[in-house]
């Protein structure tokens, strides 16, 4: 079925910044998609088009991206009369019209908004759930429920505390189902709140952009200690492990790293990549840390390669790979990491996101689907992670509605699948083997 109408508008993300929403109409009805936005962004990401008009929304308006959709993309797609099930064809049309390497003409936020809406319309056209349509597009005969990696302590660019490392996560990989993983995550989260309140006072339980707590601690080890205590108090030491997103590009300084980057600059405290790697190895030895994301700067290839080759844990590329097939191919060649963080807005279309995922999986990598810190109530990534069978998702703490929207959608999907539901569990790095 072809597209009858496309209308884009500015709406607000969870940080109160404008973002793009797209309404797409076919004979089957209205299909709506909204685009997220990141705070710690990799320099190689596709371009998110902002107006840069300082008199409006501090320059963060997206009226130009909206106009590109309404004035250029919409008429072109409607006149071409393409069927909404032809995702790759529609995405290619938009990419060809944009013509730039990084989607800087229309903006990745414009192209992605339409691409997501097309995908939802395609599922309705086929009369199947969105996750099934995505699985079909990716050539996956089965679907898998992911282990949720709840980001329960926030630092880095997501929080106003001194903590350098951005996310401390608790994936309940020992759960038997997604529903049980949610319960475990929520119970650990509430235990963590009490542990933090007792140690640092009630104001330390204020939450960051992704719903995690942001106590004013400086030592990253202290965050791990808090998690270990909370997991133990909740009674889940055998079922919950720890993941981290260091976002090291945020504190990379002249070939070294500044673990106190939110204080006044002092080069004497910078540490070398080797010293940082030793710190991580200490974490892995003393805590159940099974996954570390962006342990080094996005261009510090040597440090990545050396670290990944020396540890048995999951090493996730985010700023390093930016969901871009070219960067992923280089990281595969260099053996720089062993897991891809998949963010649809880093690359800017559904088709390219699927290509990035399949490239990583075909090289033996794990894949983790991810939200952004500036989110909306859109739940597309919940269906995406199930259809792509990646086995892991991070979309914040079990707190703040824009985060729970995704987790709740996953609960519904598991319920709908009934006895056919498969949960990745401890095989989250390679969920298809069990």
Curated annotation (Swiss-Prot):
Lineage: Eukaryota, Metazoa, Chordata, Craniata, Vertebrata
Gene3D superfamilies in UniProt: Enolase-like C-terminal domain (3.20.20.120), Enolase-like, N-terminal domain (3.30.390.10)
Record gene name: ENO1
Cofactors that this protein relies on: Mg(2+)
Residues at the catalytic site: 210, 343
Function: Both an enzyme and a lens structural protein.
Reactions performed catalytically: (2R)-2-phosphoglycerate = phosphoenolpyruvate + H2O
Quaternary structure annotation from Swiss-Prot or TrEMBL: Homodimer.
Protein name: Alpha-enolase
GO BP term (any one): glycolytic process
Annotated substrate binding sites: 158, 167, 293, 318, 370-373, 394
Enzyme kind, highest EC tier: lyase
Family affiliation: Belongs to the enolase family.
GO molecular function: magnesium ion binding; phosphopyruvate hydratase activity; structural constituent of eye lens
Compartments where located: Cytoplasm
Cited InterPro entries: Enolase (IPR000941), Enolase-like_C_sf (IPR036849), Enolase-like_N (IPR029017), Enolase_C (IPR020810), Enolase_CS (IPR020809), Enolase_N (IPR020811)
